[in-house]
Amino acid sequence: MSGNTFGKLFTVTTAGESHGPALVAIVDGCPPGLELDLQDLQRDLDRRKPGTSRHTTQRQEADEVEILSGVFEGKTTGASIGLLIRNTDQKSKDYSAIKDLFRPAHADYTYHHKYGIRDYRGGGRSSARETAMRVAAGAIAKKYLATQGIVIRGYMSQLGPIQIPFKTWDSVEDNAFFCPDPDKVPELEAYMDQLRRDQDSVGAKITVVAEGVMPGLGEPIFDRLDAELAHALMSINAVKGVEIGAGFDCVAQRGTEHRDEMTPQGFLSNQAGGILGGISSGQPIIAHLALKPTSSITTPGRSIDVDGNAADVITKGRHDPCVGIRATPIAEAMMAIVLLDHLLRHRGQNADVSVATPVLAQL
């Protein structure tokens, strides 16, 4: 299986399955001398880990990360950083009844046709369990970016039919939904409680924002910053769409509304989401991602078995009724990985570039 590595100068390679003994990652390209300890990684892993509320899977994983290499006396050495998270709460017997069946809207059918063999236990490699390593690697990127004044934060902007207006970052970490409007939390909880009674699942929309990004990151033509962000965010399990800035809303906008006019005091808007011509403009980088409803639900669904016979599938096991609830730290991680990769690439080619034009203030 190829496609397990992301990035060019700052690279992340992951391995491991949902019900295997462990998940691992190799992070290459981290600059030396960065102060780094386990808590830097564990902080974000705890935000993503399962079993933290009644609205997520009840699989209990501590997700305690181990740093195997690349850090000495509390600082990165420039060598590859090896990371490991042990799986401790697998219940593979929950999946024995569907080992010869294909769950609708899941990767079972496509993995079977591509590889001729699949790990049916919890989805194997296709499980979102893999994203724990992305979060750990992304935490390293976030730590370095912070030394450059770059801060990445995300929040839930929609759950099912419920639109969530942004009010304050202060409430995002105070609830299970990463909700920026504390007044919306009771409505979200009631919706999820009913969803669980209905034995169903629902999608969500996540917004992730990077502030403090300098102008100049991005490598046209094929490595545009927005293209690589879309690639990174689309690679997250269950993501079916990515928007940068105004996104698809630009279709209904006129040029006079969409263009981000400039004054000596700064930009007057940020419809572009902080990226112009594939290069960061110095404005906040804003991305939105849409996640589909969880495929694995207990409501019976029509499918086939490996011999092509009709079958009804009832998925047991422990699953998130809304994968978007835990997706915010994953989206932050992938944005951080992309930005650090492009920061290092920009430094390698353009470190000596200097212009007299001032950097415009952010909105």
From Swiss-Prot:
Binding positions for NADP(+) per the UniProt entry: R48, R54
Annotated InterPro entries: Chorismate_synth (IPR000453), Chorismate_synth_AroC_sf (IPR035904), Chorismate_synthase_CS (IPR020541)
Classification via CDD domains: Chorismate_synthase
Free-text comment on the cofactor: Reduced FMN (FMNH(2)).
SUPFAM superfamilies given in the database record: Chorismate synthase, AroC
Molecular function terms, GO-annotated: chorismate synthase activity; FMN binding
EC number: 4.2.3.5
Obligatory cofactor(s): FMNH2
Keyword vocabulary terms for this entry: Amino-acid biosynthesis, Aromatic amino acid biosynthesis, FAD, Flavoprotein, FMN, Lyase, NADP
Pfam short name (any one): Chorismate_synt
Family per similarity comment: Belongs to the chorismate synthase family.
Stated name of the protein: Chorismate synthase
Source species taxonomy: Bacteria, Pseudomonadati, Pseudomonadota, Gammaproteobacteria, Pseudomonadales
Gene: aroC
